[in-house]
């Protein structure tokens, strides 16, 4: 967050005293803001109107979205500032707890986008999380906005005294938060059960306050309000024909409970403001047209309330204290000097290890951005469900920092599904364990089934930091993948089962979080099984050899998103050398290198430049030849068709973002320098071409890509074109 947001002009104690002296001459004004999820944006025009009219507010109570808006307002943010903050949010970014991809260690980065579902293993059994989201990004967001308010803050000491409503899952009772971390309080009041994980608060386990008190009128009255202004976003009940989904039915049920609760309270409200929320939902964050409508309806409600507010101001002689006129904000300037760091909640990971990784030491200058950056580094290790911090006054004007952690179990199960029009449906399940049974040990297992069969298990020791420069590794794998073999004119000669069992060991090198190199010795037992007899296969390549080889792989990955990149670089390289001196039954060498560059211009225009180079020498079996026959590498050819001893690819894609989730795509590619030494394949020296267009939709299930391309029919007839359609949806593995 910009440092200017965090500056303060007057201390909260002085301003509270000024406000109290002014309020003694008139009735105290209490503002009540209801919950409503996305509909909470409608509160902002009301806050802006209060600022415009210099209408005093002496205490605030809020629930859920109302508590967030009210809490920021109570802390000293103006209505205009809150509008600027909220309008600048990308709500889709909050759908994942993952920190920016650049902070992830390479071992987690390479799994990004590979699965849709994840389950923690507790006592060896998969378990669902406490919420679909842990809410880490929400906590970071609130902490940055409210830095450096102390963790033992008395909410009455804010520029405007404040109450935040939540519900304790343990007792089933309403929890009125009056003291503690304001950032944690705001995170607690929005914790919709099963959607956002509950928040631990002393002995309480807190969730969304709207379950019991969505319009906390009684709280401002208890704080001494003589005039109550309430903003209710509940809206009318939906008609029968509008209750067509489980979400609508659940929302209606909760709405009925809330309406009953509000009936008794409304008689104590002096001014009730009800923006029109008909047809709008608390989950409309991701629909720009509906969010704009919520804002417009809030502005209309503010216009309608102007006369009533002016009448109240004149009737009671209301005026605002200097606090709001000066724009004072609770806390202090952005940067502080760190006094001490304490860590709570660590069970299996030592506090000293966490402190060393966190990296901030007594005497270091700290601000919200720096602390959040270090927390993201820790969170990216995937050892913690959430990490929260609080500040407390220290000696000599310094601040003491307390990290509160909630650890994840050491193992997890990840599940991914994908579909393409060659392999059809493929499912993948990955079992991953860290620090078990040895601290720093990483065990990765994955099995694929249905359209193709694969199994892979790997043990490595990158240490707990996941960034030790050198680590040992051992692995084993099995594959049984249907693969096509093509003639030069594009006809399918046969389909064979590419079966192999492998074992390997070697060393890995972590050069940076985005750069990795692995060197391994591998033994691979092949068992190629053609579905139809084809004599040239056996005459040129052994079908059941034992290969003993050296493999070197390298990856540089700076992509911002693996599933749908907008910016960044992905470079991959492979060297494979199979030598008779190692006891291999086939002697050959091959090398491949590829590079992907993504760049987005003017927000909606993304260019992708892809290049590939592959070469081989020696007696390379046909099933080991470089293969780029897939739509992500080359459009216009069929799956597995672009395979040869040597070739190069140049490709350019352009994507136009129509919405946040839909892109139109154009693509063109050319394969050059094609050399195929198989006697059964004829080819004409020249280039293979492909031009295509498609659409990509970033669904909740994964990226859906539908492409149609015209491309060369085959290596023997590169100028004869045919159309190829491809469909891919789901995880990327």
Where do the protein language model's features map onto the residues?
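Hydrophobic h-region of N-terminal signal peptides that target proteins for export
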Residues: 13-22
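Flexible glycine-/small-residue-rich
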Residues: 166-168, 178, 275, 343-347, ...
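Bacterial N-terminal signal peptides that target proteins for export
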Residues: 1-10
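Patatin-like phospholipase
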Residues: 22-63, 71-376, 380-385, 392, ...
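Structural signature of outer-membrane beta-barrel domains
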Residues: 236, 420, 450-452, 477-483, ...
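Gram-negative/organellar outer-membrane beta-barrel architecture
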Residues: 368-369, 373-374, 386-552, 627-632, ...
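C-terminal outer-membrane beta-barrel translocator/porin domains of Gram-negative envelope proteins
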Residues: 412-415, 539-543, 547-677, 681-682, ...
């Amino acid at each position: 967050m910009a440092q200017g947001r965090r500056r303060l002009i007057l201390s909260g104690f002085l301003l509270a005293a000024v406000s109290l002296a002014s309020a003694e001459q008139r009735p105290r004004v209490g503002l009540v803001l209801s919950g409503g999820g996305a509909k909470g944006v409608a509160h902002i025009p009301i806050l802006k109107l209060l600022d415009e009219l210099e209408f005093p507010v002496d205490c605030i109570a809020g629930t859920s979205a109302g508590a967030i808006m009210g809490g920021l307002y109570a802390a000293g943010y103006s209505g205009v500032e809150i509008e600027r903050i909220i309008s600048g949010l990308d709500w889709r970014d909050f759908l994942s707890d993952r920190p920016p991809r650049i902070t992830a260690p390479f071992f987690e980065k390479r799994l990004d986008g590979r699965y849709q579902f994840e389950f923690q293993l507790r006592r060896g059994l998969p378990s669902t999380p406490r919420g679909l989201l842990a809410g880490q990004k929400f906590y970071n967001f609130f902490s940055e906005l409210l830095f450096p308010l102390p963790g033992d803050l008395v909410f009455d000491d804010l520029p405007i005294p404040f109450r935040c409503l939540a519900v304790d899952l343990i007792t089933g009772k309403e929890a009125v938060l009056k003291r503690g971390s304001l950032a944690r309080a705001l995170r607690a009041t929005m914790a919709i059960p099963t959607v956002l994980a509950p928040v631990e608060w002393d002995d309480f386990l807190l969730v969304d306050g709207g379950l019991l008190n969505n319009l906390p009128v009684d709280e401002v009255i208890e704080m001494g309000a003589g005039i109550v202004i309430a903003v209710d976003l509940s809206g009318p009940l939906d008609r029968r024909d509008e209750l067509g989904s489980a979400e609508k039915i659940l929302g209606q049920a909760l709405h009925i409970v809330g309406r009953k609760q509000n009936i008794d309270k409304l008689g104590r409200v002096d001014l009730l403001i009800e923006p029109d929320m008909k047809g709008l939902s608390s989950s409309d964050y991701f629909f720009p047209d509906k969010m704009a409508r919520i804002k417009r309806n809030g502005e209309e409600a503010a216009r309608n309330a102007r006369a009533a507010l002016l009448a109240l101001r004149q009737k009671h002689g209301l005026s605002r204290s200097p606090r709001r006129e000066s724009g004072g904000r609770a806390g202090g300037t952005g940067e502080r000097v760190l006094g001490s760091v304490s860590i709570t909640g660590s069970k299996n990971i030592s506090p000293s290890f966490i402190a060393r990784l966190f990296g901030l030491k007594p005497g270091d200058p700290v601000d919200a951005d720096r602390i959040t950056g270090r927390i993201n580094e820790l969170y990216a290790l995937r050892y913690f469900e959430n990490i929260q911090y609080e500040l407390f006054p220290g000696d000599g004007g310094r601040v003491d920092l307390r990290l509160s952690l909630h650890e994840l179990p050491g193992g997890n199960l990840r599940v991914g599904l994908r579909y393409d029009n060659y392999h059809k449906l493929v499912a993948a399940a990955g079992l991953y364990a860290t620090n078990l049974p040895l601290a720093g040990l990483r065990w990765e297992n994955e099995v694929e089934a249905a359209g193709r069969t694969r199994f892979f298990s790997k043990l490595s020791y990158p240490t707990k930091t996941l960034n030790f420069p050198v680590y040992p590794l051992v692995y084993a794998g099995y594959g049984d993948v249907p693969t096509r073999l093509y003639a030069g004119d594009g006809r399918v000669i046969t389909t064979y089962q590419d079966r192999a069992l492998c074992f390997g060991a070697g060393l890995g090198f972590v050069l940076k979080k985005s750069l990795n190199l692995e060197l391994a010795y591998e033994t691979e037992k092949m068992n190629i099984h053609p579905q139809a007899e084809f004599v040239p296969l056996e005459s040129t390549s052994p079908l059941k050899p034992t290969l003993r080889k050296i493999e070197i792989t390298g990856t540089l990955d700076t992509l911002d998103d693996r599933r749908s990149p907008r910016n960044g670089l992905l470079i991959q390289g492979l060297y494979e050398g199979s030598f008779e001196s190692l006891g291999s039954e086939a002697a050959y060498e091959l090398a491949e290198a590829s590079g992907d560059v993504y760049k987005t211009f003017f927000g909606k225009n993304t260019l992708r430049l892809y290049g590939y180079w592959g070469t081989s020498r020696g007696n390379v079996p046909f099933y080991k030849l470089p293969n780029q026959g897939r739509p992500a590498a080359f459009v216009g050819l069929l799956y597995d068709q672009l395979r040869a001893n040597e070739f190069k690819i140049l490709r350019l894609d352009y994507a136009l973002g129509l919405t946040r989730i839909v892109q139109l795509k154009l693509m063109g590619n050319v394969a050059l320098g094609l050399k195929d030494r198989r006697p059964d394949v004829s080819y004409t020296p020249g280039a293979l071409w492909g031009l295509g267009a498609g659409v990509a939709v970033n669904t909740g299930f994964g990226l859906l890509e539908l492409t149609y391309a015209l491309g060369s029919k085959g290596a023997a007839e590169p100028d004869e074109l045919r159309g190829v359609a491809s469909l891919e949806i789901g995880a990327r593995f």
